[in-house]
């Protein structure tokens, strides 16, 4: 499973990018996106995905469907 950033809620602040341990987050077309192939939801490293902890916008980053 991977996390996904809601492009409607992303403010492009970039706070999520540097905290990702797998470097799965990158800017694209004015917002940030998460590469589902490399996102691990921080399993085995942290209790919660670090991007969710860093994001100041509620419900912007959620598990991908």
From Swiss-Prot:
Binding site for [4Fe-4S] cluster 1: 10, 13, 16, 55
Keywords per UniProt: 4Fe-4S, Electron transport, Iron, Iron-sulfur, Metal-binding, Nitrogen fixation, Repeat, Transport
Name recorded for this polypeptide: Ferredoxin-1
Cofactor binding description: Binds 2 [4Fe-4S] clusters.
Listed InterPro entries: 4Fe4S_Fe-S-bd, 4Fe4S_Fe_S_CS
Highest taxon listed in the record's lineage: Bacteria
The organism of origin for this protein: Rhodobacter capsulatus (strain ATCC BAA-309 / NBRC 16581 / SB1003)
Function: Ferredoxins are iron-sulfur proteins that transfer electrons in a wide variety of metabolic reactions. This ferredoxin probably participates in nitrogen fixation.
One of the record's GO molecular function terms: 4 iron, 4 sulfur cluster binding
């Amino acid at each position: 499973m991977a996390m996904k950033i809601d492009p409607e809620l992303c403010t492009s602040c970039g706070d999520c990018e540097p905290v990702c341990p797998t470097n799965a987050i990158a800017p694209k077309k004015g917002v940030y996106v998460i590469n589902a192939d490399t996102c691990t939801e921080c399993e085995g490293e942290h209790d919660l995905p670090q991007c969710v902890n860093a994001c100041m916008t509620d419900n912007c980053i959620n598990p991908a469907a």
